[in-house]
Amino acid sequence: MSRFFKGGSSDSDAESVDSSEENRLTSSRLKKQDDSSSEEESSEEESASSSESESSEEESESEESEVEVPKKKAVAASEDSESDSESSEEEEETESEEDSEVSDESESESESESESEEESESEEESDESERSGPSSFLKKPEKEEAKPAGLKFLRGESSEESSDEEEGRRVVKSAKDKRYEEFISCMETIKNAMSSNNWIVVSNEFDHLNKVSQKCKEAGRNPPPYIEFLSALDQKLESADKAFIKSLDAANGRAFNALKQRVRKNNRQFQSDIDRYRKDPEGFMKPAELNEIPKPAGKAGQDEVIVDGVATRGIVAPTEGLGKPEEITPADIFKYLRAIFEARGKKSTDRSEQIRLLEKLSTIAVTDYQRLRVKVALLAVRFDINTGSGQYMPIDQWNAALTELHSILDIFDANPKIVIVEQVEDENEEEEEAIAAAENNNGVIQVQGSVVSFLERLDDEFTRSLQMIDPHTPEYIDRLKDETSLYTLLVRSQGYLERIGVVENTARLIMRRLDRVYYKPEQVIRANEEVAWRSFPPTFDLTITPRATTTTPDILIHSLCVYLYNNGVSLLRTRAMLCHIYHEALQNRFYKARDMLLMSHLQDSVHAADIATQILHNRTMVQIGLCAFRNGMVQETQYALQDISTTGRVKELLGQGIQAPKFGQFTPDQDRLDKQLVLPFHMHINLELLECVYLTCSMLMEIPAMAAASSTASDSRKRVISRPFRRMLEYIDRQLFVGPPENTREYIMQASKALADGEWRRCEEFIHAIKIWSLMPDADKIKQMLSEKIREEGLRTYLLAYAAFYDSVSLEFLATTFDLPVQRVTVIVSRLLSKREIHAALDQVHGAIIFERVEINKLESLTVSLSEKTAQLNEANEKLYEQKTQHTNPQENRRRDKGGSVKRRNERTENRNRSDMN
């Protein structure tokens, strides 16, 4: 390995000695020039001045300013050279100064000294207003620490000591010395960074070294140390094995691979010199010495002053134009691509111009590899258009990105040997290198990128546009029509991923496809599938979802979900299960959806999921409740909708809007993040319909329960099923005058009062008058089901409320009164008797109900209530005791828990039997 990557070698010591000797010679030469220029200036001062002492003082002052002013100019020049806002006029002046300095270095130094003299004279003239006389400069200031650093006559009497101190602190260097030190400094920085495996710094410093080397050419010949460095760096990079590359982190790994390609490309133009160096290293290094390196003719640096060991660089980095797009050839494509990627993320980047240039490059590309590289870059730039703006991607750009993704898939179909992968160990910028590397990879040419990432971004931008467009305008409908083309692209991309066999990416794409179909009716799913498959040739088919099975939506959803169950990560499996349950509930398969939800145990872990998954879980629970309602299961509907409908934040829990806080307001960032979680309007569940279903089921359950509680003094029957319904009903009861109902809530409250009074026909009229039922499929069947439920619950309410006033009642009479079959009345009465809700006996011979007189006095009622409260208090105390002692003896705790549970169960049974006997 070369000496550049070995620490503490003798060659580096020799170089440092040469550098110090070179600096000494340079400083002595410049000092002589300063003395000659100072003599000329002193002669001019003697002719213009009348006093010898004044001329000598001015001469010393000019010498001091001549050293200080170039220092300030060098520092300013270094700052201007590093900034990007330098004007064109200053560049022209710098170039003219550099040309004059190359032709005659001593003349440029004398000119700079004359300029510094003029500046010092202007400073003296500006200070004349503060001086009291011609010899006032001989007076010392009151505070020495306030002396200006550039005035020697204010330093005191020991002028020799101050001059010696300044010579130790300041060194005047020429441009070639600066370039030499900068050249060596870059190589040392690269050497140190390589020893610490910091390849990001190596990559950055390598670009800097190339720029400096262009300024250090020896009469058209490259510097020998630079050729030696390139040879050593190339050997270092080529000797790295795959194990070493894998040991690097992601950022350094990418930097290493990029540097390897750039070094390989850069060494092509120096290949002849590198070959000559490797044949005879000593002979190659003899002809040139670094201390004789002249400055380049085109661009030149500026002399600088090194103060306290801190150097400022005045070399302006050369700028390379890329030319006009009309002059681009296919050989220049990769150079343009690299320039475009380097400009990404900068504020001054014109993305529209980049898109125009890439579109031009796509027409110039002649091979599939070139087209693919340009298309990938063009997609990345298109997605950067609205970055940070908070707006959705323009629709024309979205359609263009969709077309380009189809073009990429066309390239894959035409050339199966070209694949796009997310991680490439060694990406080649040139097509010849890519083809050569493919020979070691079974002939497969790999391009870095991700089709799935592009599809996910395209899908996200489509969703964002639907979130921001007003859903009540034709623009929303027009935008929604693009979903068919997006779904077609998802199906086609699935075929490509199945062909290359990337399971993880396939699972991500399957999840996107499932998100587009799980909430839709069967007719819409079938139509989307037909449109998608019609655009493919007959030979196109899929493995996961074959063409023959996609005509049935149930089989399609099942196939997609099963694949995610077997191959997806935990989050994808959870979302797939929720989508599957949602679809089953949408198809009115309540028991299957309920069993899948219970067997998956999602309710135990969904609180730890992300917000989008929690919203999907809430939507699934609501859909299960609506499915139960469509099947006539009132109690199951009420239980499924209870948790969401009683929170008061239904819109937020379902991802259909944001509820403003009562106190304060959202911050802009919080408001933006919350809006991203809102689902598109066509995916919303009608909240008015949801409230109507919940209140109707609450009415059918609460009214009989309230009737049972009013007929007995026992507190056990006074439990509240739906607190929101109770509060609404109590509010209506407090009204002195109640007008005709106007909205859904008022219709249900009026129907509840009629049902409580036993007027089931009037209750049925109010429920049927609600217009929201027309939004449900098979609205007539829903109304018929509600009529039957109202009659049954009216019968239960009648028996529970008026059982105390009857000795017996005929089943035929009840069937006629409530318009129910006798068999149905018998079933309802038997259920009431089995649950001990009424104390009676059923006489099937005569078809009548025989009621028993069971009157509990006040003392017995209070006794039963006290016993129940005592049992509850005892149970609470036992639980508290178990929590305190659960870590002492687990076996004893389990035994005590088991025994205590059995004991409490027996006590409750005994108390219940005793109360029944009374």
From Swiss-Prot:
Extent of Acidic residues compositional bias: 36-47, 54-67, 79-128
One annotated Gene Ontology cellular component of this protein: eukaryotic translation initiation factor 3 complex
Protein origin, superkingdom: Eukaryota
Disulfide pattern: none
Residue numbers carrying Phosphoserine: 10, 12, 16, 19-20
GO BP terms, alphabetized: formation of cytoplasmic translation initiation complex; translational initiation
InterPro entries: EIF3C, EIF3C_N_dom, PCI_dom, WH-like_DNA-bd_sf, WH_DNA-bd_sf
Chief place where the protein resides: cytoplasm
Role according to the record: Component of the eukaryotic translation initiation factor 3 (eIF-3) complex, which is involved in protein synthesis of a specialized repertoire of mRNAs and, together with other initiation factors, stimulates binding of mRNA and methionyl-tRNAi to the 40S ribosome. The eIF-3 complex specifically targets and initiates translation of a subset of mRNAs involved in cell proliferation.
Family membership: Belongs to the eIF-3 subunit C family.
Name this protein carries in UniProt: Eukaryotic translation initiation factor 3 subunit C
Gene it is expressed from: nip1
